[in-house]
Curated annotation (Swiss-Prot):
Its cofactor is FMN; NADPH; Mg(2+). FMN binds at S67, I68, T69, S97, N126, K192, T222, G272, V273, R274, A293, L294. One of its GO terms (molecular function) is FMN binding. Mg(2+) binds at E161. Homooctamer. Dimer of tetramers. This is Isopentenyl-diphosphate delta-isomerase. GO terms for biological process: isoprenoid biosynthetic process. Keywords: Cytoplasm, Flavoprotein, FMN, Isomerase, Isoprene biosynthesis, Magnesium, Metal-binding, NADP. Its EC number is 5.3.3.2. Transmembrane segments: none annotated. It comes from Methanosarcina acetivorans (strain ATCC 35395 / DSM 2834 / JCM 12185 / C2A). Pfam families: FMN_dh. It is an enzyme of class 5 (isomerase).
Length: 365
């Protein structure tokens, strides 16, 4: 029998595949970022080095297929397709929240398939901050072992929890538990927002807690408040529907959050990353990697080859962006100048950030 958590997972997957769930009135901010074109790149585009070492694992490009799904029998072929594509192209991949497998061990195979299909890829596990207090270190270790994870993402999705009628709205003690997990588990811990962004204040707290990386998960991509609007309409829950509508675009856009979160930790740019140019802009702004989920949902329902096609296109775009910026490798892109304008510039100035440094060559990232 399918439990509530498992049923919710397949509902989320179907909604993301079939309904408009992206931010509506706010963008990730990539249009406010200009890379400096080099008319004389003096490089062979086919010889660029896109490889990167991320949290102890070599990847063929600084990109991860972000957490999408798992925890329902119908999600197994989806995760199989995503993982096989990640393995073929040498990028990383995260699993969806493993909570469903804790609630029902029969669902473990929908997560294990990721490691089975991607034996050499960087794979990260996934559990909610609201749940780690309940599971403790022992429970978290089981999640890690389930997929032989290279890292563990602890997702911070309190916006979604606030809107879900079944949401866990008690956020007390989460930071202390994150610190305990970081000190006890054998693999890196990633603090992962899921669409509302990370502020400077929280980045500093997470750094102090001992996380190894931050996934900024900013506004501009999938709105989980928006996803809950559709669920609320289906269940005829006007209170949750109103909350979701109100907070559909709530949070910090991805580009702004990237700069907010620069606290001497590796950063993952997630939220509205849709092209290889977005990946390049993210790396130039200081991210160690970029990731996306929604662009792969539809293709994953079709199979591995469809995922490979979409991902290959993004990586080709990324290679072209590096070439046109005169960057032979990822470190060169880290050090390349960018110009930040528009709404993002105004936001960052009001928050006290000096973005002029980004326009200087060899800026220290």
């Amino acid at each position: 029998m399918i439990n509530t958590t498992s049923r919710r997972k397949i509902e989320h997957l179907k909604l993301c595949a079939e309904s408009p769930v992206e931010a509506r009135g706010v963008s990730a901010g990539f249009e406010d970022v200009t890379l400096i074109h080099r008319a004389l790149p003096e490089l062979n585009m086919d010889e660029l080095d896109l490889t990167v070492d991320f949290l102890g694992k070599r990847m063929q490009a600084p990109f991860l297929i972000a957490s999408i799904t798992g925890g329902h029998p119908d999600t197994l072929p989806v995760n199989a397709a995503l993982a096989a594509a990640a393995e073929e192209l040498g990028v990383g991949i995260g699993v969806g929240s493993q909570r469903a497998a804790i609630d029902d061990p029969a669902q473990e195979d929908s997560f294990r398939v990721v490691r089975d299909k991607a034996p050499n890829a960087f794979v990260y596990g996934n559990v909610g901050a609201a749940q780690i207090r309940q599971y403790g270190v022992e429970g978290v270790e089981k999640l890690i072992e389930m997929i032989d994870a290279d890292a563990l993402a602890i997702h911070l999705n309190f916006l979604q929890e606030a809107i879900q009628p079944e949401g866990d709205r008690d956020a007390t003690g989460c930071l202390d538990m994150i610190a305990e997990i970081c000190s006890m588990v054998r693999i890196p811990v990633i603090a992962k927002e899921t669409g509302a962004g990370i502020s400077r204040e929280d980045a500093l707290l997470l750094h102090k807690a001992g996380v190894s990386a931050i996934d900024v998960g900013g506004v501009g991509g999938t709105s989980w408040a928006g996803v809950e609007v559709y669920r609320a309409k289906e269940s005829k829950d006007p209170v949750s529907e109103r909350l979701g509508e109100l907070f559909w675009d709530f949070g910090i856009p991805t580009v702004a959050s990237l700069i907010e979160s620069r606290v001497s930790l590796p950063l993952i740019a997630t939220g509205g990353v849709r092209t290889g140019l977005d990946i390049a802009k993210s790396i130039a702004l200081g991210a160690s990697a970029a990731s996306a989920a929604l662009p792969f949902v539809g293709p994953s329902l079709e199979g591995k080859e469809s995922v490979v096609k979409v991902l290959s296109c993004m990586l080709d775009e990324f290679r072209a962006a590096m070439f046109l910026c005169g960057c032979a490798n990822i470190q060169a892109l880290h050090n390349s100048p960018v110009v930040v304008t528009g709404w993002t510039l105004k936001y960052l100035e009001q928050r006290g950030f000096n973005v002029k440094d980004y326009s200087l060559p060899k800026n220290a990232l």
